[in-house]
Amino acid sequence: MSGNVYKTLLTLLVYGLIMHCNVYCSPDRWTPVPGAKLEEEVYDEDGNTLQDFALRAGAPGGGGPRPRWGRCTALYYPPGKRHADGIFSKAYRKLLGQLSARNYLHSLMAKRVGGASSGLGDEAEPLSKRHIDGIFTDSYSRYRKQMAVKKYLAAVLGKRYKQRVKNKGRRVAYL
């Protein structure tokens, strides 16, 4: 996967978290931290005035709305989701580490194969092309050695090559 795909996925993940936070932790669903005050008047999206959610000390169960902060965090961070998010984050970090290590290894191999004096930089041949060329060269060298060994064995065993000159002047070799 390319870097743009990762950036897009990360952007969507952040956007989803922000939207989730806006839905489940909007001012009408949570109670501020004790001691913190909301502005005097709070409005929702339609322009309606919302209740004051400040905690009232000494009024257990009566008078005002119950604190909803615990319920909001319970919806937003259930233990199973936290565990799943932790597993995903760990696996994602491991994947990113492997990808960066692979990219670093490829850059080191390119420097070593290309050499520091080549000066081609990014315009150098890809490593796969060099690898294929190396395989072809090795195969061709092996073939030439095998043919030389056959020729030598034929000469040693007495089956010398017979060459005939045909009418057109071509030489034909026989084993």
Curated annotation (Swiss-Prot):
Main location: secreted
Modified residues (Lysine amide): 168
Molecular functions per Gene Ontology: neuropeptide hormone activity; peptide hormone receptor binding; pituitary adenylate cyclase activating polypeptide activity; type 1 vasoactive intestinal polypeptide receptor binding; type 2 vasoactive intestinal polypeptide receptor binding
Family matches, as InterPro entries: Glucagon_GIP_secretin_VIP, VIP/GHRH-like
Compartments (UniProt record): Secreted
Name of the protein: Glucagon family neuropeptides
Family: Belongs to the glucagon family.
Signal peptide: 1-23
